[in-house]
Amino acid sequence: EMCIRDSTYPKPIICWGHGIVMGGGLGVMAGCSHRVVTEATRIAMPEVTIALFPDVGGSWFLNHMPGKSGQFLAITGASINAADAVFTGLADRFIGSEHKATVLEQLRRSAWSDDSAVNHARVRHILRPLTEQSIGSMPGGQVEPHLTVINALCDGDDVHQVVDNIVNQQTSDQWLSRARDGLAHGSPLAALWISRQLQETRHSSLREVFQAELMLATNVVRYPEFAEGVRALLLDKDRNPAWAYKTTREVPAELLEQFFQAPWATNPLGEL
């Protein structure tokens, strides 16, 4: 509900995405009207490693990324930086972190209006010159230069072939290698429900996305795969999860289907 309010709130909301921006933090940032990233920004949706899925609106913003980059980032959990965030639409501006105090001071000094459009314009007026001053310090991105490869890897007859393409790729590229390994070590079952969720919400509204994510999350957390992922990564930290299936092809179709069946008569977010 908060994320929906953020995305429709009339007043400007500035999110300063400095450092690690993952999980719920990324969902909050995605709904803000003025999203700023810095040279230290690190973004990822690594839910495949704990047998979850990119929620808090991930089904929306991943489906709106260029080419197949959203699907690739979702099933591999690959990490991206500020340049990637701007390219994929997760952020609106890159501003060097040294300008944060200037931004705050100018916001304090601004004469705000009762007109929401005027206030948004004033925020842009403050951020724009600092964006221009920061161009030279923006790090090189990974998604845009790799987009052709990403699109080819994700161009499979089905999700199993896409997974095979990524896991079996032979590459010396460090970023692609880490993405490959993320999927290879992640939950095969999670890779399936992540891909299915993205497919089913391709043409959904933002409200419909949150309703669908709540349903999937409720079903996922009740299944032992999620508990095993949390145990291996966050509790025992042995990074050796005993996944229920070794490959996506071993997962019974009827099992996957269960995660997409509503566990209630009425969705708790039905009145969004």
Give the residues covered by each predicted segment.
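Glycine-rich beta-to-alpha active-site loop
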Residues: 7-50, 72-73, 77-78, 82
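C-terminal amphipathic alpha-helical interaction region
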Residues: 216-219, 224, 228-272
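Short, small-residue-biased leader/transition segments that mark boundaries at the very start
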Residues: 2-4
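Amphipathic alpha-helical blocks and their helix-capping loop/short-beta junctions
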Residues: 96-183
